[in-house]
Amino acid sequence: MNKIEKSLFPITLLFLLVFSCSSNIDKEVPTTTPEPEIYLPSLSETIEYVSPSVVAINISTVALDRFFIPRIRSADGSGVIISEDGYIVTNDHVIKDAREISVILNDESVYQGKIIGRVPYSDIALIKIDTEQELVPIEFSSSKELKVGDWVIALGNAFGLAGTPTVTAGIVSAKERVIETEDDRTLTDMIQTDAAINEGNSGGPLVNLSGKLVGLNSTIMRGAEGIGFAISSDLVLRYINDLLEFGEVQIPRDGIEGRTLDPNFINTLCEVGYNLCELDENFKGVAILEIATDSPAVKSGLLPGDIIISIENKPVRSYGEYISWTYNFRPGDTIRLNIIRGQEEIEVSLVLDKN
């Protein structure tokens, strides 16, 4: 090997090593496509679309002070226009003690409201204003179409603040919740949301991104952040239609007299001969105590001593909860009950009639 060849050999070797390493590096470094940026939609168009259907409600009540002197007090709530001729839906607890009802529209015009009908056990009320003004009724969407995780918007007269409705947004956190309220109501088929529902928002709409009503804002869980509840739109429509058509709610009848199970009651039933001694003391359900003659319960084959554990596959933990669930149905509807009789679980179909 001559001198030129000797001097070129190290250079050639170095070049090959560098080229080989760079090729390996190129092969080992993965290439990625940047993820497209995702933007949350603006809610401004939806809010602008819904706001004319939202009203503020101010009520005056008479209450006795500590010296038993009558005093006039005021309170605020919200409502939703549901027809062009002035019908408005709100919460029963907003108007239940009202001496006078003032309804403030989106343009700040004020009208006197009158109560058309109340559904206290479901916290729904229907009121009406008389006006020649062109009203914008809200559109409804079936709450059955809602899914956990869907975006929702709550509107209402929060804290009685003047002007346009207060707007908050969040998601559907859960469906078909059962809530015991501070005024001893058992509310069923409730939509749970983390959209803030503040004082004064009660009776306002919970809408989807299309601006359609999916719920009626009702209550919050005291001491908890981000837990509010709205009555499902399907339930609201069911009661509104009854009030408009019949002037009252068509309450179904099953013919059952029952009681919530608790440890002491389970022991008592066991001692008097009911076959319930094997039940855990924390077992939840409703014991059937009596059945009315010639009632839907008789025709379905139910017996005293049967334990109702679910209705339409929804767990039943108290007698009040059971009644509230049955009130969601109408006379003529067929409901499925799961019961325990002895050591056996049975499914029973029951056709409700009119109370």
Q: Locations of the language-model features?
A:
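N-terminal activation segment of mature serine protease catalytic domains
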Residues: 22-68, 100, 147-148, 241
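Gly/Ser-enriched beta-turn/beta-hairpin loop segments
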Residues: 63-73, 116-122, 161-164, 176-191, ...
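Catalytic nucleophile loop of clan PA
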Residues: 80, 196-216
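Short, small/polar residue-rich loop motifs at catalytic or cofactor-binding pockets
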Residues: 74-76, 98, 198-202, 224, ...
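Short, flexible surface segments
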Residues: 51, 78, 97, 142, ...
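C-terminal recognition in membrane/secretory proteostasis and scaffolding
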Residues: 9-12, 17-31, 45, 114, ...
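Conserved active-site neighborhood of the chymotrypsin/trypsin-like protease fold
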Residues: 34-38, 63, 81-162, 224, ...
